[in-house]
Amino acid sequence: MTISNLLKQRVRYAPYLKKVKEAHELIPLFKNGQYLGWSGFTGVGTPKAVPEALIDHVEKNNLQGKLRFNLFVGASAGPEENRWAEHDMIIKRAPHQVGKPIAKAINQGRIEFFDKHLSMFPQDLTYGFYTRERKDNKILDYTIIEATAIKEDGSIVPGPSVGGSPEFITVSDKVIIEVNTATPSFEGIHDIDMPVNPPFRKPYPYLKVDDKCGVDSIPVDPEKVVAIVESTMRDQVPPNTPSDDMSRAIAGHLVEFFRNEVKHGRLPENLLPLQSGIGNIANAVIEGLAGAQFKHLTVWTEVLQDSFLDLFENGSLDYATATSVRLTEKGFDRAFANWENFKHRLCLRSQVVSNNPEMIRRLGVIAMNTPVEVDIYAHANSTNVNGSRMLNGLGGSADFLRNAKLSIMHAPSARPTKVDPTGISTIVPMASHVDQTEHDLDILVTDQGLADLRGLSPKERAREIINKCAHPDYQALLTDYLDRAEHYAKKHNCLHEPHMLKNAFKFHTNLAEKGTMKVDSWEPVD
């Protein structure tokens, strides 16, 4: 076959050029029930050519439900995994996913899914925890990894994400490398720590966000590599939801809080390394910081979005570490237009390092994430709507919130339903599912205000959250619930964290029955 000049330039290890294949030539390698690893994190840096070829094969041969795989990715993959879900090609998926087709398949029971702390998922995979049912002692049959270059020693230069690729390659029987020639080479911005298992594991030596070990590519045994495939498809990241009055209000509350912490000496003037999740609230917070005159900021996070480019360009941000650069097409164009300056202030690491509790605590990270709901005592649900319907997965929120110096959650105070513009309260009497406990959360912010929960007892937290964060439509209801719960608990000598179990989920049951959480009354309790 003809090898493009671009591919020859990117693949600097000559023996690999003898392994160049078209994606469709690899179809016979894939068998029903295999265990696959994909590169990628938050929809970027994922393989495209081989997954698409497998979709075409399933479509042409009516193999829906007959060619299915156990699929492991560092976090969410690109649109390919949703097409795999639509074609019934996934048996099991972990640890995080984004997209309506795959979430629908999970909630209909057609895909078995488990989520896991992203700092732990790759290492637990290498331990064999997720493949205990295998009889051949293998972990992964194939890892399909996207590269933007291959160095002279055969090692892999990833693209805009690292994720769990180092661990996947270590425990994979065979490796397929997709070299993406539609994306510029990312060589020089990665820092790769290869997995070392206990009892031989050593502490990560990093003391600042820009410290590095100096390994900028992923080592791989060339004998494992069965094929090189050229990919010419760029990552498809949809446009970000623009900030609105709600998200800007949250950002304003946070900026004011940070200024007050600096004023009282609890934070330095350049704050501490920032972690921010995904979504329009997270983007609005970063946009707010860009206009807040904070200088010499640093970032230690999972994912960098377009809003961080503003911080780089206005000189506010000195350095950022992440495991993924999830930029829209316009965002990548902005980054590549100023690539020489940009790449020296950015480091992409594996997710076991970016999300590592040891590093998060040592650096004193300020963590900011968005929950589904938070109850009056500060237990947060990040994953399961009404306790049962999976959204995306836990992700890295708990990695950061459990270990950060400041653990912050932000959310709208209310969301609309079909029958009520404020039919869903983010603040509920009892969370229908708990991912982050009351012991993990320092600050809660909604468009209504900011609740500082540090050092408060449960009853004090409840009053603070209701008064500062609940939507006005729900403040009286929540206060009434708390008053009644305290009255009941006082009679029964259980006043530490008062609840009425008979009414604890009445917001949720009322929503299911009437389309709103605005309950008419509480059940009487003795």
From Swiss-Prot:
Keywords on record: Acetylation, Cytoplasm, Glycoprotein, Hydrolase, Phosphoprotein
PTM-bearing positions, type N-acetylthreonine: T2
Post-translational modification: Glycosylated; contains mannose.
Chain sites annotated for binding CoA: G277, I278, G279, N280, I281, N392, G396
Domain of life: Eukaryota
Positions of post-translational Phosphoserine modification: S350
Positions annotated as active site in the UniProt record: E302
InterPro entries, per the entry: AcetylCoA_hyd_C, AcetylCoA_hyd_C_sf, ActCoA_hydro, ActCoA_hydro_N, NagB/RpiA_transferase-like
One GO term (biological process): acetate metabolic process
Substrates-to-products reaction catalysed: acetyl-CoA + H2O = acetate + CoA + H(+)
Keyword Oxidoreductase: no
Chief location bin: cytoplasm
GO molecular function: acetate CoA-transferase activity; acetyl-CoA hydrolase activity
Subunit structure: Monomer.
Miscellaneous remark of the record: Present with 4890 molecules/cell in log phase SD medium.
Assigned protein family: Belongs to the acetyl-CoA hydrolase/transferase family.
Function text: Presumably involved in regulating the intracellular acetyl-CoA pool for fatty acid and cholesterol synthesis and fatty acid oxidation. It may be involved in overall regulation of acetylation during melatonin synthesis.
Name the record gives this protein: Acetyl-CoA hydrolase
Organism: Saccharomyces cerevisiae (strain ATCC 204508 / S288c) (Baker's yeast)
